[in-house]
């Protein structure tokens, strides 16, 4: 095996960022094609995805892979991006 040291911290942060990006993309597709933001199905998908990401962040924090502040920042950034997306969607309709 090569002498390649795996940096689990960087890997954890990158995976969490990818999941946040996936959630943003999922919600964007849903807003563009399927439902209105006031729709219960939309809200349920958003709540479920955000809850899942928060649990992933909590798990990574408990393992010491990310700092609590980094997890809070990731959630806050995603919430701001989703809010902006929501505002843009509402202004188009």
Swiss-Prot record:
Domain of life: Bacteria
Signal peptide: none
Pfam families found in the cross-reference section: DUF1507
Name assigned to this protein: UPF0358 protein lmo1070
Family the UniProt entry places it in: Belongs to the UPF0358 family.
Stored InterPro entries: UPF0358 (IPR009983), UPF0358_sf (IPR036270)
